[in-house]
Amino acid sequence: MTLIDHRKIVESIVKAIEGEESVQGVFLSGSLIDGNKDQFSDIDLGIASINNEETFEKAYSLRHAIMEAVGKPIDSVERGWENCKMVAVLYGRSQFPPLGLEVDVIFSQLRHVSEQMPYADYEIVFDRSGTLRQALAKLSRRKPKEEVQKEIRLHLAWCPFYVHDALKACERGDSPPFHTLLDEIRKQVFFAAAASRDQQVHGSKRGLKYLSASERLAFESSYHGFNKGTIQKLTDLYVAKLKELEVRYQVGPDVEQLQRTLKELL
């Protein structure tokens, strides 16, 4: 099986847009550079324009040239947020076997590059005058401790509600919401496990890598049960991972409160 040459595709994209003066630079992010690359990796690119609205729109108009530089797309979707615009493009398996390819490109003015993919590793692949390197040098690649602490406490606050609703779904014999609710707790497990190693996860993606072999077995067993014991085992694992964070993130009292609440529910 021929593997996708992600680097060659990135080079084709850069070649297609580097002649446009409004583009100041292009950087690569995501699994291609953070140690998680595999044959199924997406391509995540950030593009920075000159700092004014007109040149930003001109740079964004290059999205069609970018699509064509990669191949013939089978679908695409555009969205935007405060200072950024994004296009996600999908290519079929006939062009990129075995599963196709997704290319995500985010555009912003140079002064807003930190808003494109915050706290992400990056690699500059085109920098017209060195200004992109200067802008990205100010970007933190890790969430501040205070922000992680805030997320942990938010997860702790919601966990009992997920547990309670999962128990009700179990008693009703309603498995779809049961597993949907357990998925929320699974995400919390992954977040805590990654935080214990000073890493971060997005939802459930590649979260298993932060669990030990025995923890992974306990975690994966939660997909096969539909009873109170399944919830108990998953929350036991969650509490165990939280205890690893008590000192660093000062959440000891919060974890103790969660344990008291879970004891009352389970």
Task: Cite the ranges covered by each PLM segment.
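Conserved nucleotidyltransferase catalytic core and NTase-mimicking acidic/glycine-rich helix/loop elements
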Residues: 142-266
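Hydrophobic C-terminal alpha-helix "anchor/cap" residues
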Residues: 17-18, 26, 185
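Metal-dependent nucleotidyltransferase catalytic core
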Residues: 1-21, 32-34, 47-105
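A short alpha->loop->secondary-structure connector
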Residues: 109-127
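A short, charged helix-loop
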Residues: 122-150
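Short glycine-biased active-site loop of nucleotidyltransferases that positions the nucleotide triphosphate
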Residues: 34-40
